[in-house]
Design a protein with these regions (language model features):
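Extreme N-terminal, non-catalytic leader segments
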Residues: 1-27, 33
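Conserved lysine of the Walker
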Residues: 38
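ATP-dependent NMP and nucleoside kinases share a basic, alpha-helical "lid"
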Residues: 125-183
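Post-Walker A helix-loop "phosphate-sensing" segment adjacent to the P-loop in P-loop NTPases
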Residues: 47-59
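Hydrophobic positions on the alpha1 helix immediately C-terminal to the Walker A/P-loop
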Residues: 41
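Conserved nucleotide-sensing/catalytic segment adjacent to the nucleotide-binding pocket
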Residues: 62, 68-125
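Small-molecule kinase domains that catalyze NTP-dependent phosphoryl transfer to phosphate-bearing small molecules
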Residues: 130-131, 154-157, 185-222
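Residue-level preference for the first positions of well-ordered beta-strands
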Residues: 25-29, 57, 141-143
Length: 222
């Protein structure tokens, strides 16, 4: 990890602006453990690039849109550890990233010049929502964040070769856990339940994610 460049959030934003201005399409993957600040960083990047270069230039496409539905997780017996690597449609996510990068350098999306529609995740109902995010042909920066973008198992391991760059969010564990407890409480858990989920379920996922962060292009201190 010591050989990787470590950026501040401001430096990461500047790097994203440079990618957006470089011509063609760049797709940046942001990895990190639960609560590391991936979505916050992705939103900041997209907001600042949009402010500088115009609407539609940058779009955020979260990996969380590929969560399996709760009914599917119930059927598989995995609902009690939602967020683990086998609770996502991994092949579906990789296929979407391929579509987003297929016409790299042309400003197209999947080679057809048409808009690509991506799913989002609605935390209010704790479910993925299909066809929520438009990525039009003129988009030159796609930012996609998720836990497992650097995982070494199939099909996840294909992703680093598809992204223009991969960024890994790094943060102190105590800060990360506090963020998770707050998030889980906002979505209905009591403090004890929120902390248990953050330490046990999210914690197990964090161990897996952290082991692969050395594969990122750069680290971002979040």
């Amino acid at each position: 990890v010591s050989t990787q460049e470590t950026l501040s959030v401001d430096q990461a934003v500047a790097r994203a602006v440079a990618l957006a201005e470089a011509g063609g399409r760049s797709v940046v993957g942001i990895a990190g453990a639960p609560g590391a600040g991936k979505s916050t960083l992705a939103r900041r990047v997209v907001t600042e690039v949009t402010d500088r270069l115009g609407a539609g230039v940058a779009v955020q496409v979260p990996m969380d849109g590929f969560h399996l539905a709760n009914t599917a997780l119930d059927a598989l017996g995995r609902r009690d550890r939602k967020g683990a690597i086998d609770t996502f449609d991994a092949a579906g996510y990789v296929a979407l990233v391929r579509r987003l990068t297929a016409a790299d350098g042309t400003g197209g999306t999947d080679g057809t010049g048409s808009t690509v529609w991506a799913p989002d995740f609605d935390r209010r109902v704790d479910e993925p929502v299909a066809g929520s995010i438009a990525v039009p042909p003129e988009t030159v920066l796609v930012v996609s964040e998720g836990n497992y973008l650097l995982d070494r198992t199939a099909p996840w391991r294909e992703l680093p070769g598809l992204f223009t760059e991969t960024w890994a969010c790094v943060v102190d564990d105590s800060v990360r856990i506090d963020r998770l407890v707050g998030r889980h409480m906002r979505h209905g858990r009591d403090h004890e339940g929120a902390r248990r989920w953050a330490v046990e379920v999210d914690g197990a996922n964090a161990v897996r994610v952290t082991a692969d962060l050395h594969r990122a292009s750069v680290l971002v201190r979040t």
